[in-house]
From Swiss-Prot:
Signal peptide: none annotated. The lineage of its organism: Bacteria, Bacillati, Bacillota, Bacilli, Bacillales. Part of the ABC transporter complex PotABCD involved in spermidine/putrescine import. Responsible for energy coupling to the transport system. InterPro entries: AAA+_ATPase, ABC_SmlMolc_Importer, ABC_transporter-like_ATP-bd, ABC_transporter-like_CS, Mo/tungstate-bd_C_term_dom, P-loop_NTPase, PotA_ATP-bd, Transp-assoc_OB_typ2. SUPFAM superfamilies: MOP-like, P-loop containing nucleoside triphosphate hydrolases. Its main location: membrane. This is Spermidine/putrescine import ATP-binding protein PotA. Residues 5-235 form the ABC transporter domain.
């Protein structure tokens, strides 16, 4: 797949503070790439440099192999969608969507045709004459997205666009955004701190921490094969266990809990259940390993967990193939 954007040893300093140390990243044409990390990790700063709202202190940004460090945002063929929609309150949906085209003096007939298609893709046709105050938060976000795609950008940049929405609406819009990206075939670069959001939508995820890239991979690679201690603790839940000079990670769904009356494998240790948590379709057991004193998490179905009570002695263990060695 062709690389549309290249970030080459880019740094960002604010005064004497280094926000992003040298960082390199290739972004493929037509992919849904998510930059994921905690607050303050540099993900939004990186997005703003790609968009042209911040200038790299060092290094180069390339679009189609052409340097764009000093190219103004409006010449980059990219559009940016924020968490706060910045819609014009006195304009209806259709006029909000057409505003950018009007400023570019796009012929009126073409404006209408392109706005019609953008509203169709974002399910806004029935709301075309409504003003923002008459729309829900999700509908307003759809208008912001329609306004961003109507100019046919090469790249759509999204900075935590669903952060202000409630859980169900956020889930609905996640599916819509992914379907929209597939239909348009353009590159989406999405910034979020929400790991579930990143996992459900992305072709690839860039995990950032303190300005560094910790790992790049598909959602399955990031979840099943975390490379670093940070990724293992930030993405989902993991049991982190000391192993010689380093650590291994074991997902709770791979930890087995057995009765002390069963024949047991030598790799299993004696432990006792300290707590049981109901987590929807599963129950989470907290088991104290008597040998290592580690507190281990294990997921079980409600039916499996029904046999246990807090304080029960059990055997706890896992298959060696389920261990992931961490850097």
């Amino acid at each position: 797949m062709k690389k549309i954007i290249k970030v080459e040893a880019v740094e960002k300093h604010f005064g004497n503070q280094v926000i992003i140390p040298p960082l390199s990243l290739d972004i493929k044409e037509g992919e849904f790439l998510t930059i994921l990390g905690p607050s303050g990790c540099g993900k939004t700063t990186l997005l703003r440099m790609i968009a042209g709202f911040e200038t790299p202190t060092k290094g180069n940004l390339l679009l189609d192999d052409e340097k764009i460090n000093d190219l103004p945002p409006y010449k980059r063929h990219m559009n940016l969608v924020f968490q706060h929609y910045a819609l014009f309150p006195h304009m209806n949906v259709e006029k909000n969507i057409c505003f950018g085209m009007k400023m570019q003096k796009v012929p009126a007939a073409e404006q209408k045709e392109r706005a019609e298609e953008a509203m169709r893709l974002t399910q806004l046709l029935e709301f075309r004459n409504r003003k923002p105050a008459k729309l829900s938060g999700g509908q307003q976000q759809r208008v912001a997205i329609a306004r961003a795609i109507v100019n046919n950008p090469r790249v759509l940049l999204l900075d935590e666009p669903l952060g202000a929405l409630d859980f169900k609406l956020r889930k609905d819009l996640q599916r819509e955004l992914k379907n929209l990206q597939r239909n348009l075939g353009i590159t989406f670069i999405y910034v979020t701190h929400d790991q579930e959001e990143a996992m459900s939508m992305s072709d690839r995820i860039v995990v950032m921490n303190k300005g560094h890239i910790e790992q790049i991979g598909t959602p399955k690679e990031i979840y099943n094969k975390p490379k670093t201690l940070f990724v293992a603790t930030f993405i989902g839940e993991n049991n982190i266990v000391k192993n010689g000079e380093g650590y291994v990670a074991i997902r709770p769904e791979n930890v087995k809990v057995r009765s002390v009356e069963e024949p047991i494998l030598k790799e299993y240790h004696l432990g006792h259940i300290e707590d049981i948590e109901f987590v929807g379709n599963m129950e989470k057991l907290y088991v104290r390993d008597e040998k290592t004193s580690e507190l281990l998490m294990a997921y079980q179905t409600a039916e499996e967990a029904a046999q246990w009570s807090i304080g029960d002695n059990v055997y706890v263990g896992w298959e060696q193939e389920d261990e992931v060695t961490l850097n």
